[in-house]
Amino acid sequence: MKPELLETFENQYPNRDYTIEIVNPEFTSVCPKTGLPDFGTITLQYIPNKLCVELKSLKYYYLEFRNAGIFYENVTNKILDDLVKAVKPKEMKIISEWKARGGITTTVTASYEAEK
Amino acid sequence: MKPELLETFENQYPNRDYTIEIVNPEFTSVCPKTGLPDFGTITLQYIPNKLCVELKSLKYYYLEFRNAGIFYENVTNKILDDLVKAVKPKEMKIISEWKARGGITTTVTASYEAEK
Amino acid sequence: MKPELLETFENQYPNRDYTIEIVNPEFTSVCPKTGLPDFGTITLQYIPNKLCVELKSLKYYYLEFRNAGIFYENVTNKILDDLVKAVKPKEMKIISEWKARGGITTTVTASYEAEK
Amino acid sequence: MKPELLETFENQYPNRDYTIEIVNPEFTSVCPKTGLPDFGTITLQYIPNKLCVELKSLKYYYLEFRNAGIFYENVTNKILDDLVKAVKPKEMKIISEWKARGGITTTVTASYEAEK
Amino acid sequence: MKPELLETFENQYPNRDYTIEIVNPEFTSVCPKTGLPDFGTITLQYIPNKLCVELKSLKYYYLEFRNAGIFYENVTNKILDDLVKAVKPKEMKIISEWKARGGITTTVTASYEAEK
Amino acid sequence: MKPELLETFENQYPNRDYTIEIVNPEFTSVCPKTGLPDFGTITLQYIPNKLCVELKSLKYYYLEFRNAGIFYENVTNKILDDLVKAVKPKEMKIISEWKARGGITTTVTASYEAEK
Amino acid sequence: MKPELLETFENQYPNRDYTIEIVNPEFTSVCPKTGLPDFGTITLQYIPNKLCVELKSLKYYYLEFRNAGIFYENVTNKILDDLVKAVKPKEMKIISEWKARGGITTTVTASYEAEK
Amino acid sequence: MKPELLETFENQYPNRDYTIEIVNPEFTSVCPKTGLPDFGTITLQYIPNKLCVELKSLKYYYLEFRNAGIFYENVTNKILDDLVKAVKPKEMKIISEWKARGGITTTVTASYEAEK
Amino acid sequence: MKPELLETFENQYPNRDYTIEIVNPEFTSVCPKTGLPDFGTITLQYIPNKLCVELKSLKYYYLEFRNAGIFYENVTNKILDDLVKAVKPKEMKIISEWKARGGITTTVTASYEAEK
Amino acid sequence: MKPELLETFENQYPNRDYTIEIVNPEFTSVCPKTGLPDFGTITLQYIPNKLCVELKSLKYYYLEFRNAGIFYENVTNKILDDLVKAVKPKEMKIISEWKARGGITTTVTASYEAEK
């Protein structure tokens, strides 16, 4: 994974708390146990402070997971950590919803709130 | 964009707090980076004070974005600013939901609350 | 409109706060600007005090709007006023959802709460 | 109606507050005004105290309404009263949703909370 | 049932409260009254403390119910007890939704919260 | 069952083959084996010859099944026979779709075509 | 009803058989028996010959039914007759789907094919 | 599997070709390779000749697959063979739709037609 | 409109008849009567002969309609003509589905088949 | 791509024409133009002759496309060719449905029929 791929641009409305949600239904990584691909939808929700994440760079950041072996829980928390570091938001949440494996479906949700 | 297109009429029930929601699923603007059109749904929710926005004028106001190059975040905040200025509501919220680009879907939500 | 059409019957369980919701997806009135018909769904929700509204009389009350020219906001607030007057409920809410005009959909929501 | 049909069994987990929801989409009674059948879905939600309602007996209790003439509001409150008496729950709610009559759909919701 | 089948792995992000939801729509057990199979969906939601439940072991744990005679309420509370014991979470919830029997559908929801 | 309840009116467009479909999702009869009610949707499709079936009389005809013990297959064929006899259509089809019993759902479809 | 309201324009592609479908979900007329309004969706499908129906005039033609007392079967066949006369199509079909009355839903379908 | 569990009753309308569809969404068997359970929906469609299959016996016949190791293709063809032998229908079709394994969903469809 | 924007590439499987469907839900043009934008979905289906249409060039071709005043029927037939000329397919169909105007929805379908 | 990964097993019912459908909604390959991943659903339908395709081997065969650059049309025809060669079916069809790119969705369908 390469968090350095993430680019930002300046928030034009820093005085107003507003929410940006970016949904990527085409996320794929690899199960470190079986070596088989996992498929999921990654939802990013945040309230920007001074920076917004640039969409195309976010897409390229996500693409780096394509051939990486990593568990659901760690995908979710890693993306949250990388994006918090890059964007320094007021609040941020990552929801990862995974296609069924063995008939069983998993969703992981992690949140961050900046100290006030 | 021409906020002066926005017309209002007098709220007949100013003593009661009630909510008006106006959904426009046929909004289109242009991506300033690629020059390609963006398509979205703009939802306006507000509690009127003394004025209500006139529907037809709102439609013509939205149409002015058709060939304008502007980012998702700025569309949302600009519409909120223009409508708050024209309608002077008690509360107002703009939700813009955008069709997928590169497989990725974006929603931006901004709110305003009048000082009491 | 004829609020005198509204009939009530005695609430058999006045000591318990319970909710009655009545949805009419076949409401129609006339746009006072264009003279063309509007179509909507009117949802009535209330907590009865001593009276409940009689269903058939409510239907006939709604029918009186069929050829009346009246704006969305006023339909909603007028129905709320008429029903509050007839039923004297503890709480009441009217939600009117209107079919698209010019591609734009409107919903108006108004509430009433009796003084305690 | 025969509330004596309702049977209960002992709650095996009385120290934990948990919720049981039982949905019957095949409820039918008779309109006392027209003599025509009404069709509805009855949803029962409760937090058991020492007793749980036995499913088959609940089904037979509901069947007793099949040829009884009774209004929507009274069906809902009567079922709540009968079940509260039989099951002595910590909390209980009855939601009755009725098929359209004259194009109009009705839902009645009544709740009970035991004194603590 | 064999709670000893449940395996855990170390939570890599113990300092952050995040939620894991695991849905199994292919659960089946046997009705102790009729000897006929029951079919349901078991949803597990929890905030891990130091441990996460291993998915494959959870699947094998669920499979042990396949030929066991047990009531809906007990399935739900037993799974909660076994998982709380194995995973020692901060919070945990089990929702069991059962296919209709005699036209009637049942859902049981039980929760656990660790003492703070 | 009382086929004599079925009333007809004269087809105003006998020279044109057109189709009438009448769907009754509120049909109920009784299972002759268990004595428990069955619930279903009866769909009638026909091409009228000289007569059309009158809607209200059809409703009253269907109501006669409410407390009658009769199997799915026989309900379907009996309704087809009674309606063919009363309406003398060019073509007619009855589709009965029944709510699940023991988790199993049944649909029966029977057709009639007049000799040409 | 006023078939003279129907206007047409010249088909620009008379040498190609193509299909035009126009769906009006906001049709309303009056039941001649009860005097109560009926609500339906009218679908028009046709292959134009030399003429196409003008949309706005079609809308005004439909509006004339708003306060007319007329049965479902006759609405359908009358609209077909009026449109065939005005548009002289190669083929035409009218489907009228009506909201439930007494829990029962009706659909009427009538077709026309020009002699070749 | 025990085809001898299948019971039949006499078709009361042998002179009319009509269709019976019986859908069982609660079918389960075991994968002979992995020993893990498979879940599917079995749809049976047939035109009876002199016999109809009795619903309860069909349910018990299906239950015998619960702990049997058998492939999708063979489940489908075996059920068709057993039912054709027991019911001697004019036509019969079995559709088995299986829940995803490894993200992949399978449906098998087999038909029988009696010689005329 | 600029048909010269359409680019093609060589069909790699010219000996097999196969179907390509390309759906564009983001089509917009302008109503020549009102000057207001129309929104629609254009579906292209074809069996290639020696050429396939290049996707990006198709997108740019569609974009040329954005500010052009043209009726539904002509959009559909014009696109068909331009694509037939550029791609020389064995068969081709264009379906244009338009968002409601005045509550009324229109779909136009036109087909082409090469002489054999 | 490695067609040699495809394994088969003997069809146990070679005398009966029956259909097997296998849907893989987790297919991904790479666009040869942009180097970005494509996502699609591959549906395989076939009537087996003497052989059936083994599910797990089919999954591994599909996985080989994960990092291959190949156009939609060629994916579809290549899979058909490989599977026809391995399985020698009576009939076979491949349907590939691709997620939107630039707002535009593509579906490719190719079929094979053995000579009789």
UniProtKB/Swiss-Prot annotation, chains A, B, C, D, E, F, G, H, I, J:
It holds the Pfam family QueF. GO terms for molecular function: preQ1 synthase activity. It is found in: Cytoplasm. The keyword Cytoplasm applies. It comes from the Bacteria. InterPro entries: GTP-CH-I_C/QueF, NADPH_dep_7-cyano-7-deazaG_red, QueF, QueF_type1. It catalyses: 7-aminomethyl-7-carbaguanine + 2 NADP(+) = 7-cyano-7-deazaguanine + 2 NADPH + 3 H(+). Keywords: Cytoplasm, NADP, Oxidoreductase, Queuosine biosynthesis. GO terms for cellular component: cytoplasm. The keyword Transcription does not apply. Its main location: cytoplasm. It is an enzyme of class 1 (oxidoreductase). Gene3D superfamilies: 3.30.1130.10. Its EC number is 1.7.1.13. The active site is at 31 (thioimide intermediate), 38 (proton donor). Pathway: tRNA modification; tRNA-queuosine biosynthesis. Substrate binds at residues 53-55, 72-73. One of its GO terms (biological process) is queuosine biosynthetic process. Catalyzes the NADPH-dependent reduction of 7-cyano-7-deazaguanine (preQ0) to 7-aminomethyl-7-deazaguanine (preQ1). Belongs to the GTP cyclohydrolase I family. QueF type 1 subfamily. This is NADPH-dependent 7-cyano-7-deazaguanine reductase. It comes from Chloroherpeton thalassium (strain ATCC 35110 / GB-78).
